[in-house]
Amino acid sequence: MAPAASRLRAEAGLGALPRRALAQYLLFLRLYPVLTKAATSGILSALGNFLAQMIEKKRKKENSRSLDVGGPLRYAVYGFFFTGPLSHFFYFFMEHWIPPEVPLAGLRRLLLDRLVFAPAFLMLFFLIMNFLEGKDASAFAAKMRGGFWPALRMNWRVWTPLQFININYVPLKFRVLFANLAALFWYAYLASLGK
């Protein structure tokens, strides 16, 4: 290992356990990129829902210790089967459809993400959550009528600067992770819409 890299890690304060965990994550990312991103998305999505429940409890000043275990489970399923894999392939194909050398590539990528991927992904979120919650088509239609546009407008406000950074400056293999970390708070917002 290069001395400069070792020194940088030491200065960053990474202990042995975080270094090993990071090395293991990078190895899995290289060997099993879709599965690693799916697992990461599932875990962080569940954590986002758990965070939403904790925020909701604090806001309502509830003292009960009970949590809706189904919420994090639904978000874990959605993150594992949809967010991780779909985001992986979207970022991968976007990199090939709009390579960095293309004029205005950053703007084109952002427009593709914001005007095509974001609305479709949000609609998919509402559909899958409706199914996982055991609700019928009329509940989905009501959620789309009442929650889709407010959620999409909030998505555009919150995610546009984050996605500009993610799409144009974050290395391809880390884009799903970057989005997942930001999504901790986004899923907390979406979960609060469901209440």
From Swiss-Prot:
PANTHER family xrefs: PEROXISOMAL MEMBRANE PROTEIN 2, PEROXISOMAL MEMBRANE PROTEIN 2, PXMP2 MPV17
Keyword Manganese: no
Keywords: Membrane, Peroxisome, Transmembrane, Transmembrane helix
Keyword Metal-binding: no
Family to which the UniProt record says this protein belongs: Belongs to the peroxisomal membrane protein PXMP2/4 family.
Job of this protein: Seems to be involved in pore-forming activity and may contribute to the unspecific permeability of the peroxisomal membrane.
Membrane topology qualifier: Multi-pass membrane protein
Self-association state and partner proteins as the record states: Interacts with PEX19 and SIVA1.
All ranges on the Peroxisomal side of the membrane: 52-75, 136-173
Source species, domain of life: Eukaryota
InterPro entries, sorted: Mpv17_PMP22 (IPR007248)
The gene coding this protein: PXMP2
Entry's Gene Ontology cellular component terms: cytoplasm; cytosol; membrane; peroxisomal membrane; protein-containing complex
Transmembrane segments: 31-51, 76-96, 115-135, 174-194
Intracellular or extracellular location(s): Peroxisome membrane
Cytoplasmic side: 1-30, 97-114
Protein name as it appears in the record: Peroxisomal membrane protein 2
Chief location bin: membrane
